Amino acid sequence: MQLTPLHIQGGRELRGEIAVQGSKNAALPIIVASLLSSEKVTLHGIPRLSDVYTILDLVHHIGTQHQWVGPNSLELHTPSIVNTDAPYALVNKMRASFVVLGAILARAGQARVSMPGGCAWGPRPVDQHVKALRALGAEISEEGGNFHARRQGSLNGTFVFELLTVGGTHNAVLAAVLGDGVVTLENASIDTDVVDLIEFLNSLGADIQGAGTNTLVIRGVQQLRGGEYTVIPDRIEAGTFMMLAAATRSQLTVRNVRPDHLRAVSAKLQEMGVDILEAGNSLIVDARQRELRPVNVTTQSYPGFPTDVQPQMSALLATVPGTSVVQDPVYPDRLTHVAELHRMGANITVSGYTQVIQGSALHAAPVKAADLRAGAALFIAGLTCTGETVIDGVQYLNRGYENLAERLCGIGATAQQTELAVAMD
């Protein structure tokens, strides 16, 4: 099937409730982590996204049997590792696939994994992944774009990450779980997705201490049992919907959230003049009849303002009168949304990783998403404009937002995306 562009009729106030899916960024490494157990694992809250199907293809190649046992529930079973390689054809679509290196190495003692792919907005190196595994005793070589890893016995020792890295922490944790060694990771990521991975592994019998701190101690165990686990809500999707409410000057109830995971986003929106009320696992976001204020935003590692909602915040600020400044030192090249927002009338000047935004009303236009979060920025911008905005590149949106058009319609938007059958020769 081939997807048509997303058609949005904007300029309407939105209303009602929208539920957040399980976290894609938590689900992907947890699916990979299921490789470490020979017993059945059932996961709940798994979003049906293209990235999830990509990682399922990868673990299936390695030896996992899987089936959907509910709308967002997935059963995984890896009795044995049948392939210790992760070829380019399976990993080139998504950077998160590189964490299979640590998982295969732990379960099988050796692995060959190609360099990863993903959104094409600049370099995101994996050097910290490789340095960590080498420091802990793995032998790793690189040849022809492939990493070959081998271990003799259990991983052991201490590694200090040179910078905070979510994926690097994932890989080192996965590699160290099985065996009889003791691994200490310093300057480890405290990101919510890392904590969720650790809590999942511990629920299967792993011995990992320090989740949510910068020091992790992993004591190897001989095997992991099966189990059942629910992934955390997607804080990036939640933040996107919060910004959507603000941009359209609407009131939305965003359900199935962890408010404690969204403190930085909530604080910045409140600084702009948006009312946010916590109600259990929901946030009521109210920007009706408000004169929003420009703000300055700088991305940081968690618990700071997340880079994954930087483009969405830029789209919101493009509608707010006055001068705002957005800086993204975490991923300086995450700027593909800017040229497309220009097509909609946005006044954004870029210097390095800094955007200076002069806010004003936007207008509908045909635009194209070049990556996932740029696509989110464009649908936010499109919903602020009177008239029809047509967003091409919807395959990127489908990497992070399940049934987007249907869910937008549920809160009062007019949005349409269809599938076309493609004739095969």
UniProtKB/Swiss-Prot annotation:
Positions of post-translational 2-(S-cysteinyl)pyruvic acid O-phosphothioketal modification: C119
InterPro entries, alphabetized: Enolpyruvate_Tfrase_dom, Enolpyruvate_Tfrase_sf, MurA_subfamily, RNA3'P_cycl/enolpyr_Trfase_a/b, UDP_GlcNAc_COvinyl_MurA
Principal cellular location given in the protein's record: cytoplasm
Reactions it catalyzes: phosphoenolpyruvate + UDP-N-acetyl-alpha-D-glucosamine = UDP-N-acetyl-3-O-(1-carboxyvinyl)-alpha-D-glucosamine + phosphate
Enzyme Commission identifier(s): 2.5.1.7
Classification via PANTHER family: UDP-N-ACETYLGLUCOSAMINE 1-CARBOXYVINYLTRANSFERASE
Protein name: UDP-N-acetylglucosamine 1-carboxyvinyltransferase
